[in-house]
Amino acid sequence: MSDVKKVVLAYSGGLDTSVIVKWLQETYDCEVVTFTADIGQGEEVEPARAKAQALGVKEIYIEDLREEFVRDYVYPMFRANTIYEGEYLLGTSIARPLIAKRLVEIANETGADAISHGATGKGNDQVRFELGAYALKPGVKVIAPWREWDLNSREKLMNYCEEHDIPVDFSTSKKKSPYSMDANLLHISYEGGILEDPWAEAEEDMWRWSVSPEAAPEQPTYVELTFDKGDIVAIDGEPLKPHEVLSRLNRMGGDNGIGRLDIVENRYVGMKSRGCYETPGGTIMLRAHRAIESLTLDREAAHLKDELMPKYAEVIYNGYWWSPERKMLQAAIDATQDNVNGVVRMKLYKGSATVVGRKSEQSLFDASIATFEDDAGAYDQKDAEGFIKLNALRLRIAAGKGRQAD
Protein backbone atom coordinates (compact mmCIF):
# COMPACT_ATOMS: atom_id res chain seq x y z
CA MET A 1 0.00 0.00 0.00
CA SER A 2 2.97 2.31 0.48
CA ASP A 3 3.27 2.82 -3.28
CA VAL A 4 0.13 4.99 -3.21
CA LYS A 5 1.02 8.56 -2.29
CA LYS A 6 -1.89 10.51 -3.75
CA VAL A 7 -5.45 9.47 -4.65
CA VAL A 8 -8.17 11.35 -6.56
CA LEU A 9 -11.57 10.59 -5.05
CA ALA A 10 -14.97 11.13 -6.67
CA TYR A 11 -16.42 13.06 -3.72
CA SER A 12 -20.05 13.98 -3.09
CA GLY A 13 -19.64 15.41 0.39
CA GLY A 14 -22.05 12.83 1.79
CA LEU A 15 -21.58 10.24 4.51
CA ASP A 16 -19.99 7.49 2.42
CA THR A 17 -17.40 9.54 0.57
CA SER A 18 -16.53 11.58 3.67
CA VAL A 19 -15.71 8.32 5.43
CA ILE A 20 -13.70 7.26 2.38
CA VAL A 21 -11.50 10.38 2.62
CA LYS A 22 -10.44 9.54 6.16
CA TRP A 23 -10.20 5.81 5.42
CA LEU A 24 -7.85 6.45 2.48
CA GLN A 25 -5.71 8.77 4.58
CA GLU A 26 -5.37 6.18 7.34
CA THR A 27 -5.27 2.95 5.34
CA TYR A 28 -2.93 4.12 2.59
CA ASP A 29 -1.20 6.96 4.47
CA CYS A 30 -1.74 9.06 1.35
CA GLU A 31 -2.84 12.52 0.27
CA VAL A 32 -6.41 12.72 -1.00
CA VAL A 33 -7.56 15.00 -3.82
CA THR A 34 -11.34 15.41 -4.00
CA PHE A 35 -13.33 15.90 -7.20
CA THR A 36 -16.96 16.98 -7.05
CA ALA A 37 -18.89 17.26 -10.32
CA ASP A 38 -22.01 19.36 -10.79
CA ILE A 39 -23.97 17.43 -13.42
CA GLY A 40 -27.32 18.86 -12.42
CA GLN A 41 -28.03 16.79 -9.33
CA GLY A 42 -29.97 19.72 -7.91
CA GLU A 43 -27.90 20.12 -4.77
CA GLU A 44 -25.39 22.80 -3.86
CA VAL A 45 -21.93 21.39 -4.49
CA GLU A 46 -19.95 24.15 -2.76
CA PRO A 47 -20.55 22.70 0.75
CA ALA A 48 -18.40 19.79 -0.39
CA ARG A 49 -15.44 22.18 -0.35
CA ALA A 50 -15.84 23.02 3.34
CA LYS A 51 -16.32 19.36 4.24
CA ALA A 52 -13.21 18.34 2.31
CA GLN A 53 -11.18 21.11 3.93
CA ALA A 54 -12.33 19.96 7.37
CA LEU A 55 -10.96 16.52 6.49
CA GLY A 56 -7.55 17.99 5.69
CA VAL A 57 -7.85 17.89 1.92
CA LYS A 58 -5.58 20.44 0.23
CA GLU A 59 -6.44 19.96 -3.46
CA ILE A 60 -10.17 20.31 -4.08
CA TYR A 61 -11.79 20.25 -7.53
CA ILE A 62 -15.41 21.38 -7.89
CA GLU A 63 -16.56 21.70 -11.50
CA ASP A 64 -19.76 22.63 -13.31
CA LEU A 65 -20.01 19.93 -15.99
CA ARG A 66 -23.70 20.32 -16.84
CA GLU A 67 -23.18 21.60 -20.37
CA GLU A 68 -20.50 19.04 -21.24
CA PHE A 69 -22.66 16.28 -19.77
CA VAL A 70 -25.69 17.05 -21.90
CA ARG A 71 -23.85 18.12 -25.07
CA ASP A 72 -21.28 15.32 -25.26
CA TYR A 73 -23.06 12.42 -23.57
CA VAL A 74 -26.84 12.83 -23.28
CA TYR A 75 -27.39 14.28 -26.76
CA PRO A 76 -25.32 11.63 -28.60
CA MET A 77 -27.18 8.93 -26.69
CA PHE A 78 -30.59 10.37 -27.59
CA ARG A 79 -29.69 10.46 -31.28
CA ALA A 80 -29.94 6.68 -31.03
CA ASN A 81 -33.35 6.77 -29.24
CA THR A 82 -31.61 4.74 -26.55
CA ILE A 83 -33.60 2.71 -24.04
CA TYR A 84 -32.42 -0.31 -22.06
CA GLU A 85 -34.70 -3.34 -21.82
CA GLY A 86 -37.54 -1.44 -23.42
CA GLU A 87 -37.99 1.23 -20.75
CA TYR A 88 -34.93 2.63 -18.96
CA LEU A 89 -33.50 5.87 -20.38
CA LEU A 90 -30.03 5.23 -18.87
CA GLY A 91 -29.89 8.32 -16.67
CA THR A 92 -27.33 6.88 -14.25
CA SER A 93 -25.32 4.96 -16.84
CA ILE A 94 -24.64 7.96 -19.07
CA ALA A 95 -23.29 10.11 -16.21
CA ARG A 96 -20.44 7.77 -15.31
CA PRO A 97 -18.16 8.12 -18.38
CA LEU A 98 -17.71 11.86 -17.84
CA ILE A 99 -16.89 11.44 -14.15
CA ALA A 100 -14.40 8.68 -14.97
CA LYS A 101 -12.78 10.89 -17.60
CA ARG A 102 -12.31 13.78 -15.18
CA LEU A 103 -10.97 11.49 -12.46
CA VAL A 104 -8.27 10.31 -14.84
CA GLU A 105 -7.52 13.82 -16.11
CA ILE A 106 -7.19 15.20 -12.58
CA ALA A 107 -4.97 12.27 -11.63
CA ASN A 108 -2.71 13.19 -14.54
CA GLU A 109 -2.75 16.89 -13.61
CA THR A 110 -1.93 16.30 -9.93
CA GLY A 111 0.46 13.39 -10.34
CA ALA A 112 -1.80 11.06 -8.38
CA ASP A 113 -1.00 7.36 -8.17
CA ALA A 114 -4.61 6.17 -8.00
CA ILE A 115 -8.27 7.08 -8.26
CA SER A 116 -11.10 6.05 -5.95
CA HIS A 117 -14.90 5.98 -5.94
CA GLY A 118 -17.73 5.23 -3.53
CA ALA A 119 -19.64 2.69 -5.61
CA THR A 120 -20.56 -0.52 -3.82
CA GLY A 121 -19.43 -3.99 -4.81
CA LYS A 122 -22.97 -5.02 -5.75
CA GLY A 123 -23.82 -2.43 -8.35
CA ASN A 124 -23.12 -1.46 -11.93
CA ASP A 125 -21.39 1.83 -11.13
CA GLN A 126 -18.15 0.21 -9.96
CA VAL A 127 -17.94 -1.43 -13.38
CA ARG A 128 -18.74 1.77 -15.26
CA PHE A 129 -16.22 3.90 -13.37
CA GLU A 130 -13.43 1.39 -13.66
CA LEU A 131 -13.96 0.33 -17.28
CA GLY A 132 -13.85 4.01 -18.19
CA ALA A 133 -10.72 4.62 -16.16
CA TYR A 134 -8.86 1.64 -17.63
CA ALA A 135 -9.86 2.62 -21.16
CA LEU A 136 -8.43 6.11 -20.68
CA LYS A 137 -5.42 5.27 -18.48
CA PRO A 138 -4.52 1.57 -18.77
CA GLY A 139 -2.10 1.52 -15.85
CA VAL A 140 -4.24 3.42 -13.37
CA LYS A 141 -4.72 1.97 -9.90
CA VAL A 142 -8.33 1.99 -8.71
CA ILE A 143 -9.20 1.83 -5.02
CA ALA A 144 -12.77 0.71 -4.29
CA PRO A 145 -13.21 0.92 -0.50
CA TRP A 146 -16.54 -0.93 -0.48
CA ARG A 147 -14.69 -4.00 -1.77
CA GLU A 148 -11.99 -3.70 0.89
CA TRP A 149 -13.35 -2.46 4.21
CA ASP A 150 -15.74 -4.02 6.72
CA LEU A 151 -17.87 -0.89 7.10
CA ASN A 152 -20.83 -2.67 5.56
CA SER A 153 -23.70 -0.83 7.26
CA ARG A 154 -24.84 2.74 7.80
CA GLU A 155 -24.43 2.30 11.55
CA LYS A 156 -20.79 1.28 11.14
CA LEU A 157 -20.15 4.27 8.87
CA MET A 158 -21.64 6.65 11.42
CA ASN A 159 -19.65 5.08 14.25
CA TYR A 160 -16.52 5.55 12.14
CA CYS A 161 -17.39 9.22 11.75
CA GLU A 162 -17.75 9.66 15.51
CA GLU A 163 -14.50 7.85 16.22
CA HIS A 164 -12.56 9.92 13.66
CA ASP A 165 -14.23 13.33 14.15
CA ILE A 166 -15.59 13.38 10.60
CA PRO A 167 -17.96 16.36 10.18
CA VAL A 168 -21.35 14.84 9.36
CA ASP A 169 -24.75 16.25 10.29
CA PHE A 170 -26.00 13.43 12.50
CA SER A 171 -29.31 15.17 13.10
CA THR A 172 -30.28 14.07 9.59
CA SER A 173 -27.92 11.15 9.08
CA LYS A 174 -29.42 9.11 11.92
CA LYS A 175 -32.74 9.23 10.14
CA LYS A 176 -32.11 6.59 7.54
CA SER A 177 -33.49 7.65 4.20
CA PRO A 178 -35.93 5.03 2.95
CA TYR A 179 -34.36 5.18 -0.52
CA SER A 180 -30.96 5.34 -2.12
CA MET A 181 -31.15 8.23 -4.58
CA ASP A 182 -28.95 9.44 -7.41
CA ALA A 183 -29.65 12.46 -9.59
CA ASN A 184 -28.29 14.40 -12.53
CA LEU A 185 -29.81 16.61 -15.22
CA LEU A 186 -31.30 13.63 -17.03
CA HIS A 187 -33.02 11.85 -14.16
CA ILE A 188 -33.35 10.98 -10.50
CA SER A 189 -33.34 7.35 -9.38
CA TYR A 190 -34.70 5.60 -6.29
CA GLU A 191 -33.67 2.18 -4.97
CA GLY A 192 -33.83 0.28 -1.69
CA GLY A 193 -36.31 0.55 1.16
CA ILE A 194 -39.77 -0.72 0.31
CA LEU A 195 -38.73 -0.87 -3.35
CA GLU A 196 -36.82 -4.06 -2.58
CA ASP A 197 -40.23 -5.74 -2.62
CA PRO A 198 -41.19 -5.67 -6.33
CA TRP A 199 -44.88 -5.99 -5.39
CA ALA A 200 -44.92 -2.91 -3.14
CA GLU A 201 -46.12 0.31 -4.74
CA ALA A 202 -43.83 3.30 -4.31
CA GLU A 203 -45.22 5.93 -1.97
CA GLU A 204 -46.35 9.15 -3.60
CA ASP A 205 -44.06 11.31 -1.46
CA MET A 206 -41.02 9.50 -2.88
CA TRP A 207 -41.28 11.29 -6.23
CA ARG A 208 -39.36 14.57 -6.15
CA TRP A 209 -39.32 15.88 -9.71
CA SER A 210 -42.90 15.41 -10.82
CA VAL A 211 -46.47 15.77 -9.65
CA SER A 212 -48.67 12.72 -9.97
CA PRO A 213 -50.54 12.58 -13.28
CA GLU A 214 -53.80 12.85 -11.32
CA ALA A 215 -52.65 16.12 -9.74
CA ALA A 216 -51.31 17.63 -12.97
CA PRO A 217 -53.05 20.67 -14.50
CA GLU A 218 -56.43 20.20 -16.15
CA GLN A 219 -55.25 22.13 -19.22
CA PRO A 220 -52.55 20.70 -21.52
CA THR A 221 -49.23 22.41 -22.17
CA TYR A 222 -48.06 22.70 -25.78
CA VAL A 223 -44.38 23.04 -26.65
CA GLU A 224 -42.46 23.23 -29.94
CA LEU A 225 -38.99 21.68 -30.14
CA THR A 226 -36.57 22.63 -32.92
CA PHE A 227 -34.05 20.00 -34.05
CA ASP A 228 -30.75 20.48 -35.85
CA LYS A 229 -28.94 17.28 -36.90
CA GLY A 230 -30.88 15.28 -34.33
CA ASP A 231 -30.31 17.61 -31.37
CA ILE A 232 -32.82 20.01 -29.81
CA VAL A 233 -31.51 23.56 -30.22
CA ALA A 234 -34.58 25.67 -29.38
CA ILE A 235 -37.80 25.53 -27.37
CA ASP A 236 -40.77 27.53 -28.67
CA GLY A 237 -38.37 29.30 -31.03
CA GLU A 238 -35.93 30.36 -28.29
CA PRO A 239 -32.35 29.14 -28.91
CA LEU A 240 -30.96 27.34 -25.86
CA LYS A 241 -27.81 25.51 -24.86
CA PRO A 242 -28.17 21.74 -24.40
CA HIS A 243 -28.22 21.84 -20.60
CA GLU A 244 -30.78 24.65 -20.71
CA VAL A 245 -32.98 22.57 -23.02
CA LEU A 246 -32.98 19.62 -20.64
CA SER A 247 -33.52 21.79 -17.55
CA ARG A 248 -36.55 23.48 -19.09
CA LEU A 249 -38.06 20.23 -20.35
CA ASN A 250 -37.57 18.70 -16.91
CA ARG A 251 -39.64 21.50 -15.39
CA MET A 252 -42.33 21.31 -18.06
CA GLY A 253 -42.52 17.54 -17.91
CA GLY A 254 -42.50 17.40 -14.12
CA ASP A 255 -45.28 19.98 -13.89
CA ASN A 256 -47.40 17.72 -16.10
CA GLY A 257 -46.66 14.43 -14.36
CA ILE A 258 -44.45 13.06 -17.14
CA GLY A 259 -41.51 10.67 -16.88
CA ARG A 260 -42.19 8.31 -13.97
CA LEU A 261 -40.94 4.75 -14.34
CA ASP A 262 -40.99 1.68 -12.08
CA ILE A 263 -39.00 -1.29 -13.41
CA VAL A 264 -37.06 -4.42 -12.56
CA GLU A 265 -33.85 -4.40 -14.58
CA ASN A 266 -31.04 -6.86 -15.19
CA ARG A 267 -27.79 -5.51 -13.78
CA TYR A 268 -24.55 -6.26 -15.57
CA VAL A 269 -23.16 -7.88 -12.40
CA GLY A 270 -25.83 -10.58 -12.66
CA MET A 271 -28.68 -9.72 -10.31
CA LYS A 272 -32.11 -8.23 -10.91
CA SER A 273 -32.79 -4.88 -9.29
CA ARG A 274 -35.95 -2.86 -8.88
CA GLY A 275 -35.63 0.86 -9.48
CA CYS A 276 -37.91 3.85 -9.85
CA TYR A 277 -36.92 6.75 -12.06
CA GLU A 278 -38.11 10.21 -12.99
CA THR A 279 -36.97 11.36 -16.42
CA PRO A 280 -39.43 14.09 -17.45
CA GLY A 281 -37.28 15.98 -19.94
CA GLY A 282 -35.74 12.84 -21.39
CA THR A 283 -39.16 11.29 -21.97
CA ILE A 284 -40.23 14.33 -23.98
CA MET A 285 -36.93 14.40 -25.90
CA LEU A 286 -37.15 10.73 -26.86
CA ARG A 287 -40.67 10.97 -28.26
CA ALA A 288 -39.95 14.20 -30.09
CA HIS A 289 -36.76 12.81 -31.63
CA ARG A 290 -38.53 9.70 -32.88
CA ALA A 291 -41.19 11.95 -34.38
CA ILE A 292 -38.78 14.13 -36.35
CA GLU A 293 -36.93 11.00 -37.53
CA SER A 294 -40.20 9.49 -38.74
CA LEU A 295 -40.49 12.44 -41.10
CA THR A 296 -36.89 12.75 -42.26
CA LEU A 297 -35.17 9.34 -42.14
CA ASP A 298 -35.12 6.88 -45.01
CA ARG A 299 -37.10 3.74 -44.16
CA GLU A 300 -34.23 1.25 -44.32
CA ALA A 301 -31.87 3.56 -42.44
CA ALA A 302 -34.52 4.00 -39.74
CA HIS A 303 -35.11 0.25 -39.45
CA LEU A 304 -31.40 -0.53 -39.29
CA LYS A 305 -30.97 2.16 -36.65
CA ASP A 306 -33.72 0.53 -34.60
CA GLU A 307 -31.85 -2.78 -34.82
CA LEU A 308 -28.62 -1.18 -33.60
CA MET A 309 -30.24 0.62 -30.66
CA PRO A 310 -30.56 -2.30 -28.20
CA LYS A 311 -26.87 -3.13 -28.61
CA TYR A 312 -25.94 0.54 -28.20
CA ALA A 313 -28.07 0.70 -25.03
CA GLU A 314 -26.43 -2.41 -23.62
CA VAL A 315 -22.96 -1.03 -24.33
CA ILE A 316 -23.74 2.15 -22.37
CA TYR A 317 -25.57 0.38 -19.55
CA ASN A 318 -22.66 -2.00 -19.02
CA GLY A 319 -20.07 0.78 -18.91
CA TYR A 320 -18.39 0.57 -22.31
CA TRP A 321 -18.79 4.21 -23.39
CA TRP A 322 -15.08 4.48 -24.24
CA SER A 323 -14.99 1.18 -26.14
CA PRO A 324 -14.36 0.68 -29.89
CA GLU A 325 -17.86 -0.75 -30.34
CA ARG A 326 -19.56 2.32 -28.86
CA LYS A 327 -17.50 4.62 -31.10
CA MET A 328 -18.34 2.50 -34.13
CA LEU A 329 -22.05 2.51 -33.30
CA GLN A 330 -21.97 6.25 -32.61
CA ALA A 331 -20.41 6.95 -36.00
CA ALA A 332 -23.17 4.97 -37.72
CA ILE A 333 -25.90 6.67 -35.69
CA ASP A 334 -24.52 10.17 -36.21
CA ALA A 335 -24.32 9.55 -39.96
CA THR A 336 -28.11 9.20 -40.01
CA GLN A 337 -28.73 12.58 -38.39
CA ASP A 338 -27.64 15.03 -41.11
CA ASN A 339 -31.22 15.59 -42.26
CA VAL A 340 -32.94 15.17 -38.90
CA ASN A 341 -33.94 18.83 -38.81
CA GLY A 342 -37.28 20.48 -38.16
CA VAL A 343 -39.86 21.22 -35.49
CA VAL A 344 -41.99 18.88 -33.38
CA ARG A 345 -45.06 20.06 -31.49
CA MET A 346 -45.82 18.19 -28.27
CA LYS A 347 -48.88 18.11 -26.04
CA LEU A 348 -48.07 17.54 -22.36
CA TYR A 349 -51.04 16.42 -20.32
CA LYS A 350 -51.46 14.40 -17.12
CA GLY A 351 -48.49 12.07 -17.54
CA SER A 352 -48.54 11.82 -21.33
CA ALA A 353 -46.24 13.45 -23.86
CA THR A 354 -48.02 13.22 -27.19
CA VAL A 355 -46.69 14.28 -30.58
CA VAL A 356 -49.36 16.41 -32.28
CA GLY A 357 -47.36 17.91 -35.13
CA ARG A 358 -44.07 17.76 -36.99
CA LYS A 359 -42.55 19.63 -39.94
CA SER A 360 -39.22 19.75 -41.75
CA GLU A 361 -37.69 21.19 -44.89
CA GLN A 362 -35.98 17.79 -45.26
CA SER A 363 -39.26 15.89 -44.89
CA LEU A 364 -39.65 12.72 -46.97
CA PHE A 365 -43.41 12.82 -46.48
CA ASP A 366 -45.03 13.64 -49.83
CA ALA A 367 -48.70 14.50 -49.41
CA SER A 368 -49.30 14.34 -53.16
CA ILE A 369 -48.36 10.64 -53.10
CA ALA A 370 -49.76 9.64 -49.70
CA THR A 371 -53.17 11.28 -50.16
CA PHE A 372 -56.39 9.23 -50.16
CA GLU A 373 -57.83 11.72 -52.63
CA ASP A 374 -56.98 12.16 -56.33
CA ASP A 375 -53.18 12.15 -56.60
CA ALA A 376 -53.16 13.42 -60.20
CA GLY A 377 -51.10 10.43 -61.35
CA ALA A 378 -48.33 10.82 -58.77
CA TYR A 379 -48.74 7.16 -57.80
CA ASP A 380 -49.95 4.48 -60.20
CA GLN A 381 -51.78 1.91 -58.11
CA LYS A 382 -51.50 -0.66 -60.90
CA ASP A 383 -47.76 -0.87 -60.15
CA ALA A 384 -48.62 -2.55 -56.85
CA GLU A 385 -49.74 -5.74 -58.63
CA GLY A 386 -46.27 -6.56 -59.95
CA PHE A 387 -44.68 -5.55 -56.65
CA ILE A 388 -46.92 -7.94 -54.74
CA LYS A 389 -46.39 -10.83 -57.17
CA LEU A 390 -42.60 -10.53 -57.03
CA ASN A 391 -42.59 -10.41 -53.25
CA ALA A 392 -44.97 -13.37 -53.09
CA LEU A 393 -42.85 -15.50 -55.44
CA ARG A 394 -40.91 -17.39 -52.75
CA LEU A 395 -44.11 -17.97 -50.78
CA ARG A 396 -45.87 -19.38 -53.84
CA ILE A 397 -42.94 -21.66 -54.67
CA ALA A 398 -42.82 -23.02 -51.11
CA ALA A 399 -46.58 -23.56 -51.06
CA GLY A 400 -46.35 -25.36 -54.40
CA LYS A 401 -43.88 -27.78 -52.81
CA GLY A 402 -46.31 -28.55 -50.03
CA ARG A 403 -44.74 -26.24 -47.46
CA GLN A 404 -47.92 -24.45 -46.51
CA ALA A 405 -47.79 -22.18 -43.52
CA ASP A 406 -49.49 -23.56 -40.39
UniProtKB/Swiss-Prot annotation:
Residues binding L-aspartate: T120, N124, D125
Binding annotation for L-citrulline: Y88, S93, N124, R128, S180, S189, E265, Y277
Top-level class of the enzyme under EC nomenclature: ligase
Pfam family, one: Arginosuc_syn_C
Predominant cellular place of this UniProt entry's protein: cytoplasm
GO cellular component: cytoplasm
Compartment(s) where it occurs, according to its Swiss-Prot or TrEMBL record: Cytoplasm
Positions of ATP binding: A10, Y11, S12, G13, G14, L15, D16, T17, S18, A37, G118
Disulfide bridges in this chain: none
DNA-binding is among the record's keywords: no
Annotated EC: 6.3.4.5
Domain of life: Bacteria
Single GO term (MF): argininosuccinate synthase activity
Pathway named in the protein's UniProt entry: Amino-acid biosynthesis; L-arginine biosynthesis; L-arginine from L-ornithine and carbamoyl phosphate: step 2/3
Record-linked PANTHER family: ARGININOSUCCINATE SYNTHASE
Family affiliation: Belongs to the argininosuccinate synthase family. Type 1 subfamily.
Protein name: Argininosuccinate synthase
Species whose genome carries this gene: Chromohalobacter salexigens (strain ATCC BAA-138 / DSM 3043 / CIP 106854 / NCIMB 13768 / 1H11)
